[in-house]
Regions:
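Conserved donor-binding loop and adjoining core beta-sheet/short helix segment
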Residues: 42-91, 101-108
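Acyl-donor binding region in acyl/amide transferases
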Residues: 78-80, 86-171
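Short, Lys/Arg-enriched charge-dense amphipathic segments
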Residues: 22, 55-69, 139-146, 167-171
C-alpha cells in the first residue's frame, strides 16, 4: 500500500517547490510521455490558465514524489474549453456559471511504478484517489458540475468510480 498525501491550493498558497515540481511533472506527463504540443520552458509546463486564481490538487507519495495533479478553473473566468476548444461542445453554449468548474491537466502517472503506460494513469488507485479528492475540493468551492476536455480514459475512470459523465460531443 502506497501512502498518498494530497495538497490543494493556489499558486499563492502552495509551497513554491511543490509548484515547480507540479510544472515539471506536467511536462513529463503531457509533453514527454503523451507528446502534446504545449508551452514548455526548461522542462516546466504552464499555460495562460495557470493564474493566481487557478486551483490545484496535487498528490505525492511517501517519498514526496508527485504522483498526480489536477487543475480547477471557474467557468466565470477564461478557461481551456471555453477559450481554446469551444468547438468540442458540439454547438452547446459555453458554460459560464459559479457552480460549473473546469477540470484540466488531470494526470496520475507514478513514474516509479512498474508500469507507466499512458492508459494506466486513468485506472490506478492514485487516479481514483486524485479524482475523488478533486471532486471533493471542487464541491467545497461550490461546484455542482465539472467540465473537462479529456481523453476517453477519463470518462471510463469517472464511470468506474461511480460518477455520472455526459459527453458534450463525439470522442
Amino acid at each position: 500500500v502506497t501512502l498518498m498525501e494530497i495538497y490543494t491550493g493556489t499558486s499563492g498558497t502552495l509551497p513554491p517547490d511543490l509548484l515547480t515540481g507540479l510544472s515539471r511533472y506536467r511536462h513529463k506527463v503531457f509533453v514527454e510521455k503523451l507528446g502534446w504540443q504545449l508551452q514548455s520552458q526548461d522542462g516546466l509546463e504552464a499555460d495562460q490558465f495557470d493564474r493566481a486564481d487557478t486551483l490545484y490538487v496535487v498528490t505525492q507519495d511517501d517519498t514526496r514524489e508527485i504522483t498526480g495533479t489536477a487543475r480547477l478553473l471557474p467557468t466565470t473566468r477564461p478557461y481551456l474549453l471555453g477559450e481554446i476548444f469551444p468547438q468540442l461542445l458540439n454547438g452547446l453554449p459555453i458554460p459560464n456559471a459559479d457552480d460549473v468548474w473546469e477540470l484540466s491537466r488531470f494526470a496520475a502517472v507514478d513514474f516509479k511504478a512498474a508500469t507507466t503506460s499512458a492508459l494506466g494513469q486513468f485506472s490506478s488507485p492514485t487516479a481514483v484517489g486524485l479524482l475523488k479528492a478533486t471532486l471533493t475540493y471542487a464541491a467545497g468551492l461550490g461546484a455542482n458540475k465539472l467540465i473537462t476536455v479529456s481523453p476517453i480514459g477519463i470518462e471510463r475512470l469517472l464511470s468506474r468510480a461511480g460518477f455520472r459523465a455526459h459527453r458534450a460531443g463525439p470522442p
